[in-house]
Design a protein with these regions (language model features):
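Acidic, glycine/proline-rich low-complexity segments that act as flexible tails and inter-domain linkers
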Residues: 1-17, 46, 62-87
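Short, glycine/charged-rich beta-strand-loop motifs at protein surfaces that mediate ligand recognition
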Residues: 12-13, 26-31, 44
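Extended alpha-helical surfaces
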Residues: 17-20, 41
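Short, structured motif recognition centered on aromatic/hydrophobic residues
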Residues: 20-28, 37, 57-58
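Short alpha-helix boundary/capping elements
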Residues: 30-34, 65-66
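Short conserved catalytic/interaction loops centered on acidic-Pro-aromatic/His motifs
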Residues: 33-42, 55
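Accessory, usually C-terminal, subdomains that scaffold auxiliary metal cofactors
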Residues: 47-51
């Protein structure tokens, strides 16, 4: 399952890993998958996505979700940014 369902998706050559993670961040936010969003926010950073690109991705999705969901996504992103600053 991990190799077939996850590894092959993340290793496809059409998109670089940072862009792929940004797409996954958008999908997780839009579908209210907060635990996965948390993981992929970290993943996007580790894959080389800039903080501004992640912020812009969440901003683009914010028009599609409720104000409460958008606020929750911003809080989660702020926590991830704080954790990244510690390391």
């Amino acid at each position: 399952m991990i190799v077939e369902g996850y590894g092959k998706v993340l290793s496809r050559p059409q998109l670089d890993l940072a862009r792929r993670e940004l797409c996954i961040v958008a999908a997780c936010a839009a579908s209210r998958q907060d635990r996965q969003l948390h993981s992929h926010l970290h993943g996007a950073l580790h894959a080389g996505a800039s903080e501004s690109a992640i912020t812009e991705t969440l901003g683009a999705i914010s028009v599609l979700v409720s104000p409460d969901d958008a606020a929750r996504h911003r809080m989660l992103w702020a926590r991830v940014q704080g954790a990244a600053d510690v390391h």
